[in-house]
Amino acid sequence: MLAVAVLAAGKGTRMKSALPKVLQPLAGATLVERVLASAGNLQPERRLLIVGHQAERVEQQLAPLGGLEFVLQQPQNGTGHAVQQLIPSLQGFEGELLVLNGDVPLLRSETVEALVEQHRASGADVTLLTARLEDPTGYGRVFADADGQVSSIIEHRDCTDEQRSNNLTNAGIYCFNWTALANVLPKLSTDNDQGELYLTDTVAMLPKAMHLEVADADEVNGINNRRQLAQCEALLQQRLRHHWMDEGVTFIDPESCTLSEGCSFGRDVVIDPQTHFRGRCVIGDNSRIGPGSLIEDASVGTNVSVVHSVVREASIGNDVAIGPFAHLRPAADVGDGCRIGNFVEVKKSQLGAGTKVNHLSYIGDAQLGEKVNVGAGTITANYDGVNKHRTMIGSNSKTGANSVLVAPINVGERATIGAGSTITKDVADGALAIGRARQMTKEGWAERKV
């Protein structure tokens, strides 16, 4: 059996944020969510989150994930003290305890799986993850023999100058035999510079301690301040971009684009500079997104072009052109072959196949059939000051430039709305509707004014 415990009680003082450190966002997910995901493939029987600072807020945010047990650490008196809080919860548990840090979000699932696998194969009481760092300042040093048996871990602040020359560092990630660990946890002492209980001290108390050296030291980067958060964001973005490049996606200027873990791209997709993807996005084959676009929680079909536009919680069919400077808001559903042009906003509306809204229009709370041609400056006036109302436009209809459709209204199929009209009544199939003042021309007006 396997239990996973994530240390998530710290204040994160150096972040200087009202948000708990483990809830800071990184490429579309919180730090602690990424840590939990790294152990997901192991399918642990127990998942425990040790909380302290703003515990209620952390629990509220993470509870929807399901299957989490929250354990309170109050006060926060070190990593050893945190794990001591698990003793009541794991009473009678027999198996391994994997201990992860809630602020180490770049850890790959393959690394976590290798740690647990090695621990089980070696029969060790504890196996810890280690990394060799060019600059190990601030990290605990791991001392081990040639066979990988660990003799001790000494925190940086407690090291002598000679001990600090060792660059094998403790990543703060452990796989324990829980029964063995539970026996030594009560023996921890605060006899150190910080006066805290260190989980690292249990390593020297256990008969057999082994270590696994991680291949990529960036995986165990911890986050304590905004600069480190930005560094981890850059590393994770690079990892995501490289993954999708290997899957057949072209980035014209990779470092100017950002992705989230929930993105999915088809083959031969091209991403132009300054384009950003947030949340869960699906982009179909042969589409080109950007430059200067934001796609968030949206679905985009094949052979689609999106230029200098914002697409949020919307669905776009195949062979569609969007932009420049279009805004697709939540519940916009754009059918195959549509054209949404410059300075067009679409909200909570369905556009049938082949419909064109080329210029300067607002389409809100509307349903447009197939091959509708919306003239420049057409507005669906959906709000009466109290409620929103629907506009229905049938297939093959046309609206002239600068027309306003005052909802609720139903325009039939093959209907035409004259330019400059304000339409307040339903329009039948095949009808022409004109709703504007008759033009009055006064000859010689300019001369009379003089």
UniProtKB/Swiss-Prot annotation:
Binding site for acetyl-CoA: 376, 382-383, 419, 436
Keyword Hydrolase found: no
GO molecular function, a single term: glucosamine-1-phosphate N-acetyltransferase activity
Record family assignment: In the N-terminal section; belongs to the N-acetylglucosamine-1-phosphate uridyltransferase family.
EC number of this enzyme: 2.7.7.23, 2.3.1.157
Pfam families: Hexapep (PF00132), NTP_transf_3 (PF12804)
Note on how the cofactor is bound: Binds 1 Mg(2+) ion per subunit.
Stretches the record annotates as N-acetyltransferase: 248-450
Alphabetized Gene3D superfamilies for the sequence: Hexapeptide repeat proteins (2.160.10.10), Spore Coat Polysaccharide Biosynthesis Protein SpsA, Chain A (3.90.550.10)
Function: Catalyzes the last two sequential reactions in the de novo biosynthetic pathway for UDP-N-acetylglucosamine (UDP-GlcNAc). The C-terminal domain catalyzes the transfer of acetyl group from acetyl coenzyme A to glucosamine-1-phosphate (GlcN-1-P) to produce N-acetylglucosamine-1-phosphate (GlcNAc-1-P), which is converted into UDP-GlcNAc by the transfer of uridine 5-monophosphate (from uridine 5-triphosphate), a reaction catalyzed by the N-terminal domain.
Region described as Pyrophosphorylase: spans on this chain: 1-226
Subunit annotation: Homotrimer.
Residue sites binding UDP-N-acetyl-alpha-D-glucosamine per the record: 7-10, 21, 73, 78-79, 140, 155, 170, 224, 329, 347, 362, 373
Name of the protein: Bifunctional protein GlmU
Catalytic activity: alpha-D-glucosamine 1-phosphate + acetyl-CoA = N-acetyl-alpha-D-glucosamine 1-phosphate + CoA + H(+); N-acetyl-alpha-D-glucosamine 1-phosphate + UTP + H(+) = UDP-N-acetyl-alpha-D-glucosamine + diphosphate
Keyword terms, alphabetized: Acyltransferase, Cell shape, Cell wall biogenesis/degradation, Cytoplasm, Magnesium, Metal-binding, Multifunctional enzyme, Nucleotidyltransferase, Peptidoglycan synthesis, Repeat, Transferase
List of residues binding Mg(2+): 103, 224
Primary location: cytoplasm
Keyword Cell inner membrane: no
Any one of the GO CC terms: membrane
SUPFAM superfamilies per UniProt: Nucleotide-diphospho-sugar transferases (SSF53448), Trimeric LpxA-like enzymes (SSF51161)
Region described as Linker: spans on this chain: 227-247
Localization annotation: Cytoplasm
Transmembrane stretches, start-end: none
Cofactor(s) annotated in UniProt: Mg(2+)
